[in-house]
Amino acid sequence: MKESFKVCFCCVRNFKVKSSEPPEEIKNLFHDYSQDDRMSADEMLRFVIQVQGETHADINYVKDIFHRLKHHGVFHPRGIHLEGFYRYLLSDFNSPLPLTREVWQDMNQPLSHYFLYTGHNSYLTGNQLNSNSSIEPIVKALRNGVRVIELDLWPNSSGKEAEVRHGGTLTSREDLQKCLNVVKENAFQVSAYPVVLTLEDHLTPILQKKVAKMVSKTFGGSLFQCTDETTECFPSPESLKNKILISTKPPKEYLQTQISKGSTTDESTRAKKISDAEEQVQEEDEESVAIEYRDLISIHAGNRKGGLKNCLNGDPNRVIRLSMSEQWLETLAKTRGPDLVKFTQRNLLRIFPKTTRFDSSNYDPLVGWIHGAQMVAFNMQSHGRYLWMMQGMFKANGGCGYVKKPDVLLSNGPEGEIFDPCSQNLPIKTTLKVKIYTGEGWNMDFPLDHFDRYSPPDFYAKVGIAGVPLDTASYRTEIDKDEWFPIWDKEFEFPLRVPELSLLCITVKDYDSNTQNDFAGQTCFPLSEVRPGIRAVRLHDRAGEVYKHVRLLMRFVLEPR
């Protein structure tokens, strides 16, 4: 078969198109585990156990594989030929991730023992300056498994009602009741585990009282309310199933927060706002407002009193949620990494993007995760490598939006030493061997001239580990020129110190010597979820949506030290 590409107006370039065929190693494996060019069910079972590492498999498991292959027209009653074996290896039921979306981790520990799928400014459709506010991003986030939704609450133009908007910008406004309604309707569509509604509160006490009634009426029995402000331990995700938790600053901390934010506001204007707010507090029945609003709050957000020096001291009698910017986190990670880990063993730590990310870009989530930060807040409307890592992390544990932190972040050493993710002395625990054989499906999911106008694509792949600094590494294959079905046949090794905090990131691009290389697919997933063996790795687009046909054939081997 040939493909023709026009060059200018009169010339035509012809390229021979190869079909997808098994690499030599796959052919050899088939011959090793088959007889007379057919692989029987018993021989397939031996392959599945010995090569794929599926020790739980039995003959019925293999018969199910054979049954599925009937739909590909490559099945024979006496077994499968090489083509059928290759189709099995590239099939959806040979994924590197678990085939069923089941929650398998212990969900009975405190909330602080889990990473939570967390959104930032969840109502924005685009940039942070002048995009629209809408309920649609909230719906999409919840249906994608996000468990922490953030709403910024401000007085409307009349000052008589609360509305959702990004204050100090030209973004549009959204009705608070609409936002609450879609949270209620979509909170538990894909996961029964609790949704945390983070309210960034810029309201007067009068409006706080109105919001308290609105929230209580909307969520009713789904609203989890904890009257004990001095709880020493957060409840577990299991005990909070189908519950909505409110996290915000208690009313008494509202004025303190406004004062601390004064660096970007004119002093006289800020002083007048504080004075007006103080008068309202005095004029209203402060106690009743505080009680109504406090009763909503089940995760109390504490102030960062004392700056960098004292913010991680914690309180042995009370757990809180502390928020800090990515910049503050980076500073603390360099100087007080173990203190961050210790703080997050009991308390919740929320990280948010720096204020200069006007384009709604994101930051490296691993900096927060390797230090135990549970709520690494992301702009879900922005695409790129860091969002792929976020999406990859929360493929774990059945995609329920909660991933249990590894023991290294929760337990101290025999002499009380706390894990330091940036240590240069971490021992190697295991070696990951990743072999990338080939890829297929681009010719079915993309137009003929999508990558190159005058020739088939020149694909190469990048394979990397994102984790603690010593584990982070990336490699790339050679470029396979003019091929819709690239064959790389390349193996990479990754010595890993903390594999339980590692993400495997894979990207494919089309090389172009004159312009920027074209994106051709990506995927990312936790190493803790990977099934060893030869697997079909499906790729996703920039937004994280899976392609229908594009996939890679890869092999994963973990060798403990």
Swiss-Prot record:
Catalytic activities: a 1,2-diacyl-sn-glycero-3-phospho-(1D-myo-inositol-4,5-bisphosphate) + H2O = 1D-myo-inositol 1,4,5-trisphosphate + a 1,2-diacyl-sn-glycerol + H(+)
Residue ranges constituting the C2 domain according to the UniProt record: 414-541
Keyword Oxidoreductase: no
Residue ranges annotated for the PI-PLC X-box domain, each copy included: 105-249
Active site: H120, H166
Tissues expressing this chain: Expressed in stems, leaves, roots, flowers and siliques. Predominant in the vascular tissues of roots and leaves.
EC nos: 3.1.4.11
GO cellular component: plasma membrane
Ranges annotated as biased composition (Polar residues): 256-266
EF-hand domain span: 21-54
Induction note: By abscisic acid, osmotic stress and environmental stresses such as dehydration, salinity and low temperature.
Positions of Ca(2+) 2 binding: D452, D510, D512, D518
Subcellular location: Cell membrane
Keyword Amino-acid biosynthesis assigned: no
Annotated PI-PLC Y-box domain residues: 294-410
Matches recorded under InterPro entries: C2_dom (IPR000008), C2_domain_sf (IPR035892), EF-hand-dom_pair (IPR011992), EF_Hand_1_Ca_BS (IPR018247), PI-PLC_fam (IPR001192), PLC-like_Pdiesterase_TIM-brl (IPR017946), PLC_EF-hand-like (IPR015359), PLipase_C_PInositol-sp_X_dom (IPR000909)
Alphabetical keyword list: Calcium, Cell membrane, Hydrolase, Lipid degradation, Lipid metabolism, Membrane, Metal-binding, Transducer
UniProt-recorded Gene Ontology molecular function terms: metal ion binding; phosphatidylinositol-4,5-bisphosphate phospholipase C activity; phospholipase C activity
Functional description taken from the UniProt entry: The production of the second messenger molecules diacylglycerol (DAG) and inositol 1,4,5-trisphosphate (IP3) is mediated by activated phosphatidylinositol-specific phospholipase C enzymes. Required for secondary responses to abscisic acid signals.
Protein name, UniProt field: Phosphoinositide phospholipase C 1
Organism in which the protein naturally occurs: Arabidopsis thaliana
